[in-house]
Amino acid sequence: MQFATVQPVTARSDLPVITDEEAAALARTTVNLFRAWELTDAEARTLLGDMAQRTWARWKTGNIGRIDRDLRARMAILMGIHKALRYLFTDPARGYAWIRRPNAAFAGRSALDVMLRGEITDLIDLRAYLDAERGAW
């Protein structure tokens, strides 16, 4: 039996990096988006990767601390979802309400139900669905 030779993969330096300032702005915008979506604190914390209750309470008062890479990615995906909804619905209120409506594409569940499964891949899948719906392929 022979093992395959594996070539090391180097990290790509050309990918965009979310700076600390951008992450703080994303956090403030995420708080506002969650207000528009009328999320409960528990729902908001789940979408943010099971954020601690105390941390979420601080965020709501504008006290944003250190934001790790996973959380930055989650917030960026959530902003992509919001942007896609704004493209699909000219009336922002319709887009905000859409996330709670049952959807045949999600076996009768809402987009929020899909996102509340809690995995970052659930957010990615919803973003991909919305991009396909708006014809961004």
Model-derived features: where do they sit?
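Non-transmembrane "mature" sequence context
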Residues: 1-137
